[in-house]
């Protein structure tokens, strides 16, 4: 079998890089090479989809490239060396430039030097790295599908990143200086382990019959950034009864720091064997471990701050922003298969959007994340809502209370396999940093484990002092918890405090504690049954009157909204302060208060109002935002207020009148607008139809007069 002509392949690579044009007719790769020459970028990513679509390229060349990828990385690098244009912009010289200039002055950069050890390797001259991105045709492989036949080939693998090491320097070219003859000696390093030179291989030392003394010159040597990551199979790819498999991924150069634990990603890379080292090598025999040398990383769900909008997405977001009913459309697009819970879905939408974080001049931080606890009877779709929110959020971690220890939620001290040092391994709350942590069965957690959440929910850090490590980790996460009442179902004969059975210190940290009670109601149960049957028959939700938004559009809209930092205007200060004090007064009057109101409640009102302003793409909070925030807080306990009214013997019409009268007296008004009256009674769970009935009944009694056009109220 004759040797393959790799020089011919280098010519093909040069032709592709030189002549390939994108859809706009621009020389894509020559523009990238110009930016590399100007030292603006270091990575040259060759997309094999471009190579597949290139008219002058044969399928055999693409096949050879994917089956012997490491060799073709060096072939493309050699082609880039020949094609690299002259820089068009000035840039300051770094240490590497100074060394290369000095070598040129000394004449040591001459490639015709007879001694191969004194020839400067091409690798040390390069400022760039060449990466291949695998063709996007077909679905990515799972870890289980990558076998021994794929060794040396370019593969695409999807999975979730479970851990990442620190970024360390990895030697690519070792440079020595001989103390006896003064020559520079170069040693290319192709693996993570190498044997340093102890004898000078130069011709002068050999002629003088001397061993020489090569001294390693670290500043002249070339190092690459190196990071090791562990990737695990996604849950949906694991067969029944099996445990998820994992794979080691090596990231070099510009690919480091691209992933973090918890990210769902797709790696393109070269599947390679690596021999065991140390004591493992004694027992391994002919068995080798495997790893993936990554050449590209693609995130399935981009972080909000990394989101780059496509033109069509920008147009769609602009159209949605102009829609007056966007708040309802976005909330109803969350889990449309789940019947009802409209207000809960609105609250969960606001949890996804959040409020801006505030940092005061003295360094004090005020959190912007909204925490929500869903507490209710079994079978009201709490867990389904949690899982759906985790799917929509770009970064989310789902865990259960009984299956999570305090260490599993915060951080554990472990020994790093790469460096053998004691390192911190982040728990669920740390993995969900800048995202959402959903904790199901919150009431089943041990009290000692639950205390780990207190610091995270307010200070948004995890403080650790164990195994000689004293540090603080960021956990800027929104906590979404689901719990059952103390006796499995809510017992109306007991007080809310007895039913909820969570400490006040924890309850006050939740912006919204939503009680979902499963009450028997003929009409509601009939509608629910029809909805569930429709979903089972058609595997899709019933018609909503509009097309529900896809999760990627939801993420794009929320990403655009999160870039705003709305402020509270001065004219709303009095209004918010009055609303907060009235909540405190109502709670003080009640024999069995339904909520635990502290100053944190005031901050919760501000956070929810700011999230609503973000949804409107507004730079300032409006009164309507504050009213909606207060309404959501009231609606979260609405089922309990209905019981209070029944116990007090009040009918809906009388109670509606009492609410309007008390609010008008508090604000010292004799003239009340219809919008204000509707807002006041909706906070208490009454409908617009009940308001109209109340207005007519009390107008007939001459208690007030109603404007025939605007329906505004004037007390007599």
From Swiss-Prot:
Q: Which InterPro entries match?
A: MCM (IPR031327), MCM7 (IPR008050), MCM_CS (IPR018525), MCM_dom (IPR001208), MCM_lid (IPR041562), MCM_N (IPR027925), MCM_OB (IPR033762), NA-bd_OB-fold (IPR012340)
Q: Which chain segments does UniProt annotate as zinc-finger regions (C4-type)?
A: 178-205
Q: Where is this motif: Arginine finger?
A: 508-511
> What's an example GO cellular component term for this entry?
THO complex
Top-level EC class, please?
hydrolase
Listed GO MF terms: ATP binding; ATP hydrolysis activity; DNA binding; DNA helicase activity; zinc ion binding
**Induction field:** By both rootknot and cyst nematode infections.
Stated role: Probable component of the MCM2-7 complex (MCM complex) that may function as a DNA helicase and which is essential to undergo a single round of replication initiation and elongation per cell cycle in eukaryotic cells. Required for megagametophyte and embryo development.
Q: How does it associate, per the subunit comment?
A: Component of the minichromosome maintenance (MCM) complex, a heterotetramer composed of MCM2, MCM3, MCM4, MCM5, MCM6 and MCM7. Interacts with ETG1.
One GO term under biological process is: DNA replication initiation
Q: What is this protein called?
A: DNA replication licensing factor MCM7
Task: Provide the catalytic activity annotation.
Answer: ATP + H2O = ADP + phosphate + H(+)
Q: Which family does it belong to?
A: Belongs to the MCM family.
Listed EC numbers = 3.6.4.12
Q: Where does ATP bind?
A: 376-383
- Location within or outside the cell: Nucleus; Cytoplasm
Question: Domain named MCM: which ranges?
Answer: 326-531
Lineage of the species this protein comes from = Eukaryota, Viridiplantae, Streptophyta, Embryophyta, Tracheophyta
Which keywords annotate this record?
Answer: ATP-binding, Cell cycle, Cytoplasm, DNA replication, DNA-binding, Helicase, Hydrolase, Metal-binding, Nucleotide-binding, Nucleus, Transcription, Transcription regulation, Zinc, Zinc-finger
- Tissue-wise, where is it found? Expressed in shoot apex and flower buds.
- One Pfam annotation reads MCM_N
- Where in the sequence is the signal peptide annotated? none
What is the species listed in this Swiss-Prot or TrEMBL entry?
Arabidopsis thaliana
């Amino acid at each position: 079998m004759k040797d393959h002509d790799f020089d011919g392949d280098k010519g093909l690579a040069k032709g592709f890089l030189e002549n390939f044009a994108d859809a706009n007719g621009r020389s894509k790769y020559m523009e990238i090479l110009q930016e590399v020459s100007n030292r603006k970028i270091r990575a040259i990513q060759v997309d094999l989809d471009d190579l597949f679509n290139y008219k002058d390229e044969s399928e055999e060349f693409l096949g050879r490239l994917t089956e012997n990828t490491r060799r073709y990385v060096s072939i493309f690098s050699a082609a880039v060396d020949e094609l690299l244009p002259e820089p068009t912009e000035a840039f300051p010289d770094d240490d590497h430039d100074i060394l290369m200039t000095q070598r040129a002055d000394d004449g040591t950069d001459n490639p015709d030097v007879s001694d191969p050890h004194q020839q400067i390797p091409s690798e040390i001259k390069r400022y760039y790295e060449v990466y291949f991105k695998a063709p996007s045709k077909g679905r990515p492989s799972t870890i289980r599908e990558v076998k021994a036949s794929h060794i040396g080939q370019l593969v695409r693998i999807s999975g979730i990143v479970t851990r990442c090491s620190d970024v360390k320097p990895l030697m690519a070219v070792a440079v020595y200086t001989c103390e006896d003859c003064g020559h520079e000696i170069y040693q290319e390093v192709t693996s993570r382990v190498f044997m340093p030179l102890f004898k000078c291989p130069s011709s002068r030392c050999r002629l003088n019959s001397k061993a020489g003394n090569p001294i390693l010159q670290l500043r002249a040597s070339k190092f690459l950034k190196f990071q090791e990551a562990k990737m695990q199979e996604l849950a949906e790819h694991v067969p029944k009864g099996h445990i998820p498999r994992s794979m080691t991924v090596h990231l070099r150069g510009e690919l480091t720091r691209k992933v973090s634990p918890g990210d769902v990603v797709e790696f393109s890379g070269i599947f390679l064997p690596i021999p065991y080292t140390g004591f493992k090598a004694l027992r391994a025999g002919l068995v080798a471990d495997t790893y993936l040398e990554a050449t590209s990383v693609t995130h399935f769900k981009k972080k909000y701050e990394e989101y780059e909008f496509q033109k069509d997405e920008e147009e769609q977001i602009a159209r949605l922003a102009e829609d007056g009913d966007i708040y309802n459309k976005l909330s109803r697009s969350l889990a449309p298969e789940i019947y009802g819970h409209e207000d809960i879905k609105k609250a969960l939408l606001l949890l996804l959007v959040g409020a801006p974080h505030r940092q005061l001049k003295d360094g004090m931080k005020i959190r912007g994340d909204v925490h929500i606890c869903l507490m209710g009877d079994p079978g009201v779709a709490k867990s389904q809502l949690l899982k759906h929110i985790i799917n929509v959020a770009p970064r989310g971690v789902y865990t259960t209370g009984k299956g999570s220890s305090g260490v599993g939620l915060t951080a554990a001290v472990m020994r790093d396999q790469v460096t053998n040092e004691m390192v911190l391994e982040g728990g669920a709350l740390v993995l969900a940093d800048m995202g959402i942590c959903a904790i199901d069965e919150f009431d089943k957690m041990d009290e000692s484990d639950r205390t780990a959440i207190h610091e995270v929910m307010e200070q948004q850090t995890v403080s650790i002092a164990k195994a000689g490590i004293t540090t603080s980790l960021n956990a800027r996460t929104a906590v979404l918890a689901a719990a059952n009442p103390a006796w499995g179902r809510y017992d109306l004969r007991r007080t809310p405090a007895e039913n909820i059975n969570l400490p006040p210190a924890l309850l006050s940290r939740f912006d919204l504690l939503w009680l979902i009670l499963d009450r028997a109601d003929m009409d509601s149960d009939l509608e629910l049954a029809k909805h569930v049957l429709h979903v089972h028959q058609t595997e899709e939700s019933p018609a909503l009157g509009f097309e529900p938004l896809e999760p990627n559009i939801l993420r794009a809209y929320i990403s655009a909204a999160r870039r705003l930092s709305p402020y509270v205007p001065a004219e709303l200060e009095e209004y918010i302060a009055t609303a907060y004090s009235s909540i405190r007064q109502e709670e003080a009057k009640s024999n069995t208060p339904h909520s635990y109101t502290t100053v944190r409640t005031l901050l919760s009102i501000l956070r929810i109002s700011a999230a609503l302003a973000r949804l409107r793409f507004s730079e300032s909070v409006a009164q309507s935002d504050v009213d909606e925030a207060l309404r959501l807080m009231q609606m979260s306990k609405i089922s309990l207020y209905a019981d209070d009214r029944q116990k007090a013997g009040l009918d809906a019409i009388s109670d509606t009148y009492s609410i309007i009268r008390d609010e008008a007296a508090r604000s010292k008004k004799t003239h009340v607008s219809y919008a204000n009256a509707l807002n006041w009674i909706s906070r208490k769970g009454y409908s617009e139809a009940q308001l109209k009935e109340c207005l007519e009944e009390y107008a007939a009694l001459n208690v007030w007069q109603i404007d025939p056009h605007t329906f505004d109220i004037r007390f007599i």
